[in-house]
């Protein structure tokens, strides 16, 4: 079945009308555009028959250049040539400056703390730079296809968070593109291989591009593409290999770049050496009157820690998917950096099988995105292909005691909507704050806050009487909306989560790892917090009851006894002995049982006062 068919309301799509749609791989280093033509997904080349468009924009005094022409300006005018903008999109200025301090650009902060790059054509945001790249790809597509595009599918790393995804959509809209869907890059690759090779079973997609790394474990069965688990690193890629070679050259020559131009020149030479080492045993780097030779073995030693880091992420993804490495039937290699022989060798050893490389790793993502775009505009209405992406980190809500109640667990298939009912804690409560959280831990302090909103207008009721339905909805692009509704009045409030900046790769890794490392401690902390919440509830109800009926229904000794036990529970609640708190709750319950019975009898007597038997039998 098709995921979506687009037609005007009340109208059916013309049976033989072919809509123009493309898939775009908006990469860190290079970008590509593809489309389905005559039933086959193909890359659309530019005017010079080049398939790869460098993800580079040069903002000169008089003109703007995008692609290879811009890349050629990188060493001549680095301050006005923006490369690897994908690393910057959706991040705060402080994050960019701390992580990428060696960038040659001059940054200023926007009103909301996002980075703006100072260029000869004014301040440019990462969204604007990305938009210029997308505009170039749009131009190539429309020139090749001979018409205006109906829509596009743009791929993003699986670990892009809400801010990074939303920024990508904003860039596309700024370029005048109709975004049909954002698609995870590994999922797009699986789609391309599933169509071309008819693969079924468990597949690992190892995606190492210029600036990001992703691993996805997928199950392909009878046309259904299901992502079982994902992992990734938003700051690991071929660019890092280049920097390692550059650092090695500096160490060998004892010469550091003195200018931005020299830095860019050295990085370019390092990149060329990396490419040479893909096919040759060694490469010569000539820089500042020095000539040094680096062997493939030396290069392998340099990149070993980064490759190992990627394989540790693979191990975590397999664990999340509850899959053993020997169950993986095929390993798909995606991204230009997977051409490095050492990467292929190590990945093959890890999974115990030779990786698949039959589709060009630079092109496979764009080809898969084009297939999905063709489905989404209704060109392939008989398709039985279904794509199921997943939520990479759990989404939850804060409950009393600083606890996190998970609404959508990590690795849940999207799009998804989940609802859960909550209630008020105090009598007469007319408002409730909904605190949206992301992460794997049990306590609020250990998770990431995504946002808060307040539901007002709850009718005053006894504690626990109100019914608040909270719905979490994640769309196909991974964007989250949360709605809270009081069921009797239908009053509601909502929020759409668009964080001002994204998670760093360290935070993503730490959030997942800490959930394993602290599982036992978290469980104990949760149980303690739950006991404290229960103690607070009991204390609150007893205090209210004493104030209302204590003087009338209790003797002085009984009143003082309950007060004493109540005070003991209030004291023990401040400690960290969960069993002691439970015993205190039980003791207070025992001490107030007779009081509770008297209150019940008094309520019944009050309700029956002045009524006869016939009134009760015939209300």
Swiss-Prot record:
GO terms for cellular component: cytosol. CDD domains: ASKHA_NBD_HSP70_HscA (cd10236). GO terms for molecular function: ATP binding; ATP hydrolysis activity; ATP-dependent protein folding chaperone; heat shock protein binding; protein folding chaperone; unfolded protein binding. PROSITE patterns: HSP70_1 (PS00297), HSP70_2 (PS00329), HSP70_3 (PS01036). Coiled coil: none annotated. It comes from the Bacteria. One of its GO terms (biological process) is iron-sulfur cluster assembly. The keyword Nucleotide-binding applies. It holds the Pfam family HSP70. Keywords: ATP-binding, Chaperone, Nucleotide-binding. Belongs to the heat shock protein 70 family. PANTHER family: HEAT SHOCK PROTEIN 70KDA. Chaperone involved in the maturation of iron-sulfur cluster-containing proteins. Has a low intrinsic ATPase activity which is markedly stimulated by HscB. This is Chaperone protein HscA homolog. It comes from Haemophilus influenzae (strain ATCC 51907 / DSM 11121 / KW20 / Rd).
């Amino acid at each position: 079945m098709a995921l979506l068919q687009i037609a005007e309301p009340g109208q059916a799509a013309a049976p033989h009308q072919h809509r123009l749609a493309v898939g775009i791989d908006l990469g860190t280093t290079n970008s590509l555009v593809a489309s389905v033509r005559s039933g086959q997904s193909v890359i659309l080349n530019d005017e010079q028959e080049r398939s790869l468009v460098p993800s580079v924009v040069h903002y000169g005094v008089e003109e703007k250049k995008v692609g290879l022409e811009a890349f050629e300006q990188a060493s001549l005018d680095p301050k006005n040539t923006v490369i690897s903008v994908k690393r910057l999109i959706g991040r705060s200025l402080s994050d960019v400056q701390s992580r990428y301090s060696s960038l040659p650009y001059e940054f200023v902060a926007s009103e909301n703390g996002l980075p703006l790059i100072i260029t000869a054509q004014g301040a440019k945001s990462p969204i604007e730079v990305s938009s210029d790249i997308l505009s170039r790809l749009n131009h190539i597509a429309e020139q090749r296809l001979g018409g205006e595009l109906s829509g596009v599918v743009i791929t993003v790393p699986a670990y892009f968070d809400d801010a990074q995804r939303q920024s990508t959509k904003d860039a596309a809209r700024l370029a005048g593109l109709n975004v049909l869907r954002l698609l995870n890059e590994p999922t797009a690759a699986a789609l391309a291989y599933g169509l071309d090779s008819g693969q079924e079973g468990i597949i690992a997609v190892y995606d190492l591009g210029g600036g990001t790394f992703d691993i996805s474990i997928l199950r392909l069965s009878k046309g259904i593409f299901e992502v079982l688990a994902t992992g990734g690193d938003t700051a690991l890629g071929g660019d890092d290999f280049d920097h390692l070679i550059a650092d090695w050259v500096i160490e060998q020559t004892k010469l550091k770049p003195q200018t931005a131009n020299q830095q860019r020149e050295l990085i370019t030479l390092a990149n060329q050496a990396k490419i040479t080492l893909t096919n040759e045993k060694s490469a010569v780097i000539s820089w500042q009157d020095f000539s040094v030779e680096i062997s493939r073995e030396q290069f392998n030693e340099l990149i070993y820690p980064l490759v190992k880091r990627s394989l540790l992420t693979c191990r975590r993804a397999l664990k999340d998917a509850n899959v053993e490495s020997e169950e993986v039937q095929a390993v798909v290699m995606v991204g230009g950096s997977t051409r490095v022989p050492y990467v292929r060798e190590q990945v093959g050893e890890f999974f115990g099988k030779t990786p698949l490389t039959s589709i060009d790793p630079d092109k496979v993502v764009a080809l898969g995105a084009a297939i999905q775009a063709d489905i989404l505009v209704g060109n392939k209405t008989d398709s039985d292909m279904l794509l199921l992406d997943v939520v990479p980190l759990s989404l939850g809500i804060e409950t009393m005691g600083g606890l996190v109640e998970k609404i959508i667990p990590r690795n849940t298939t999207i799009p998804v909507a989940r609802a859960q009912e909550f209630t008020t804690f105090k009598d007469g409560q007319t408002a409730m704050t909904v605190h949206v959280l992301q992460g794997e831990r049990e306590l609020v302090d250990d998770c990431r806050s995504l946002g808060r909103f307040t539901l007002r207008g709850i009718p005053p009721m006894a504690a626990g009487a109100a019914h608040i339905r909270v719905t979490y909805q994640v769309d196909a692009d991974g964007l989250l909306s949360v709605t809270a509704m009081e069921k009797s009045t239908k009053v509601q409030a909502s929020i759409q989560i668009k964080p001002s900046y994204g998670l760093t790769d360290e935070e993503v890794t730490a959030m997942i790892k800490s959930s394993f490392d602290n599982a036992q401690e978290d469980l104990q902390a949760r149980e303690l917090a739950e006991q404290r919440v229960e103690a607070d509830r009991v204390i609150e109800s007893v205090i209210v009851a004493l104030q209302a009926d204590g003087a009338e229904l209790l003797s002085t000794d009984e009143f003082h006894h309950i007060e004493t036990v109540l005070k003991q529970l209030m004291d023990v609640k401040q400690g960290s002995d969960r069993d002691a708190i439970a015993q205190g709750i039980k003791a207070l319950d025992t001490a107030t049982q007779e009081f509770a019975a008297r209150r019940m009898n008094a309520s019944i007597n009050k309700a029956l006062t002045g009524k006869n038997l016939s009134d009760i039998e015939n209300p």
